Amino acid sequence: MSDTTHGRVAVITGASSGIGAATARALAADGHRVALLARRVDRIEALAGELGDGAIAIEADVTDREALVAAAQRVQQELGGTDVLVNNAGVMLLGPFSSEQRADYRQMVEVNLLGAITTTEVFLDQIRANGGGDLINISSVAGRTARPINGVYAATKWGINGWSESLRQELQPDVRVTVIEPGAVGTELTDHITHAATKEATEEYVKDLAIRPEDIADVIAFAVSRPRRMTLNEILVRPTAQPS
């Protein structure tokens, strides 16, 4: 725990599993109070119970602005506003480019890109009102390179990277913007791939390669604990054995 993190309030989207849940644990251990946002309310309620009095669970879908506004009101009332926002909610619906995948494409754009933008728009005033803070956007190694079957997913992450750099310039010095670009991580992302052959191949690829969600959470905790005079703008974290 450090003076820069003790008592601060962190809002984490997609907090029901994977990187989101691991980040909640890491930030709580560093002295943050945490607001856990996700659709699977049973999971975040269990996690809030595990973390104790400084944690609240709020059912919210990042594609639903009204739900986000209600969540922000609860954070303000119960925790005193937001100091750190972690835009973690996302889906990775890989597959060959085809009209059969158009619902997946729309969902990725709405969750990965527009969801992060809307969440930030809703919570940014609280961060400013609290004297500034940290905005953490979870991107991907796919935000640096595109490959077959990940085109639209990569497009959403390239979008996150470009938008984040614009925000960094616009919001400094009061709000620090950090982009985290994970490589293969052992999460539930592959569970939701609808293209059967792609799902099987992706799961096989990450099975023995993936790093743990806690590895990314540790990086996030490190970034937000840095002295205010500095910002870690972009952090690429890959398994040591990941080729690209």
Give the ranges of each region predicted by the language model.
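C-terminal helical subdomain
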Residues: 179-180, 199-244
